[in-house]
């Protein structure tokens, strides 16, 4: 354990170095950033064996620690996932540079021209838990948008993240970018998080990515603005107008494709108007696929294998092969349930009736709403953003997938030819 004085000195040094790097990155040309991202992608490929060996240490420790199946899935790397990280960096390199974009332009009656221009936020602090791929995604998105990054990964993924960081730094510095463009807190001491959240002189925004307890701590303690992602309590509503086969395909994917991601459906709502034809097949499909179903009285009557749902189940992010299933009286009741029990993340409706669908899309107070598509599309890569640094469920500055454009703020550039303000 480090002393509080040592931790303060360590974190302040990281902050000062990040601030210096951010000033360089803000003026780095697009071509140089893209070259560095491609070099980092190649470095990750070259270091695949080292990264997997480091991940094996984390997996062994995680299993010994008794991490859940969902947490272990998030932590686990294999050659395909490492290659996906490398390709993700190359995808980000191909994105348009968000820095320097003219967001709006106008000319005043006195002849002055005014433009609102996108600029980097500066230094972004990212606090995350078990997903080592966040190391690569976050660093790449921040670099592309001209920001320096301070990463604080969880102890579960410490060795994996360090190995990925080494590859990233090698790629960045080989192309002439500052080594401090991306840094990682070099200790697993939880007290480092508290110090990081007080570095308002050096960090411009905090992005927490992890479980409810982590995000709640960050929200409570941070003196720095943050992109908030509390939970992914996502819903799929099957309307009375829904095609059953489409509903089955979407629901199975939304729940079971990957149960441990924030876009996985946690509650299935079925319109009472189609419960007689749709509910039992949907429930049976989920149970047969290995999903535990916790349901209301109607769902229990549809299949004897359904477990009674508690009040808490309707507001639970399972991140596992468990789902709550309930019957509601139409789209209005579905929207009311979602806005009451959800986390404002992602909701989907399966319906053939476009008017009902519009009611749902307009009524759900969530960052992402989908019609006839799986909630697992709640992902920056699937949105064409290259990757995401997280999904913001707040409403200030950024909402939904946070990609390169959302990692910029703006300045006003005013050009005149001698104008002065009259007295």
From Swiss-Prot:
GO terms for biological process: L-proline biosynthetic process. It catalyses: L-glutamate 5-semialdehyde + phosphate + NADP(+) = L-glutamyl 5-phosphate + NADPH + H(+). It comes from Paramagnetospirillum magneticum (strain ATCC 700264 / AMB-1). It comes from the Bacteria. Transmembrane segments: none annotated. Its main location: cytoplasm. It holds the Pfam family Aldedh. GO terms for cellular component: cytoplasm. Pathway: Amino-acid biosynthesis; L-proline biosynthesis; L-glutamate 5-semialdehyde from L-glutamate: step 2/2. This is Gamma-glutamyl phosphate reductase. GO terms for molecular function: glutamate-5-semialdehyde dehydrogenase activity; NADP binding. InterPro entries: Ald_DH/histidinol_DH, Ald_DH_C, Ald_DH_N, Aldehyde_DH_dom, G-glutamylP_reductase_CS, Glu-5-SA_DH, GPR_dom. The gene is proA. Belongs to the gamma-glutamyl phosphate reductase family.
């Amino acid at each position: 354990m480090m002393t509080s004085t040592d931790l303060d000195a360590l974190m302040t040094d990281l902050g000062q170095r990040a601030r210096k790097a951010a000033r360089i990155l803000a003026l780095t040309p697009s071509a140089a950033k893209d070259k560095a991202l491609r070099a980092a992608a190649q470095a990750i490929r070259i270091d695949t064996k080292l990264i997997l060996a480091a991940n094996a240490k984390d997996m062994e420790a995680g299993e010994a620690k008794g991490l859940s199946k969902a947490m272990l899935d998030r932590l686990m790397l294999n050659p395909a996932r490492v290659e996906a990280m490398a390709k993700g960096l190359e995808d980000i390199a191909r994105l348009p540079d968000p820095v320097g974009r003219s967001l709006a332009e106008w000319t005043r009656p006195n002849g002055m021209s005014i433009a609102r221009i996108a600029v980097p936020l500066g230094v972004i602090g990212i606090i995350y838990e078990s997903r080592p791929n966040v190391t690569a995604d976050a660093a790449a998105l921040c670099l592309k948008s001209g920001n320096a990054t301070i990463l604080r990964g969880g102890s579960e993924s410490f060795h994996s993240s360090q190995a990925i960081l080494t590859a990233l730094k090698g790629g960045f510095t080989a192309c002439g970018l500052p080594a401090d463009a991306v840094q990682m807190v070099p200790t697993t001491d939880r007290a480092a998080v508290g110090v990081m959240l007080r570095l308002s002189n050096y960090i411009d925004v905090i992005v927490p990515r992890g479980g409810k307890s982590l995000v709640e701590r960050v929200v409570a303690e941070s003196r720095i603005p943050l992109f908030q992602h509390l939970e992914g309590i996502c819903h799929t509503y099957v309307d009375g107008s829904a095609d059953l086969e489409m509903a089955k395909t979407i629901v199975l994917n939304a729940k079971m494709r990957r149960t441990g991601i924030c876009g996985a459906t946690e509650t299935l709502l079925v319109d009472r108007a189609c419960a007689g034809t749709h509910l039992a097949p949907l429930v049976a499909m989920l149970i047969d696929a290995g999903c535990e179903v916790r349901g209301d009285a109607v769902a229990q009557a549809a299949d004897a294998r359904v477990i009674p749902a508690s009040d808490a189940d309707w507001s639970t992010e399972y991140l596992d092969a468990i789902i709550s299933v309930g019957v509601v009286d139409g789209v209005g009741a579905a929207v009311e349930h979602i806005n009451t029990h959800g986390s404002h993340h992602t909701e989907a409706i399966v319906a053939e009736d476009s008017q009902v669908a519009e009611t749902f899309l307009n009524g759900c107070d969530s960052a992402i709403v989908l019609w006839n598509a799986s909630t697992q599309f709640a992902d920056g890569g699937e949105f064409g953003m290259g990757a995401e640094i997280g999904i913001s469920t707040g409403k200030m500055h950024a909402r939904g997938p946070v990609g390169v454009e959302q990692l910029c703020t703006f300045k006003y550039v005013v050009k005149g030819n001698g104008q002065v303000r009259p007295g």
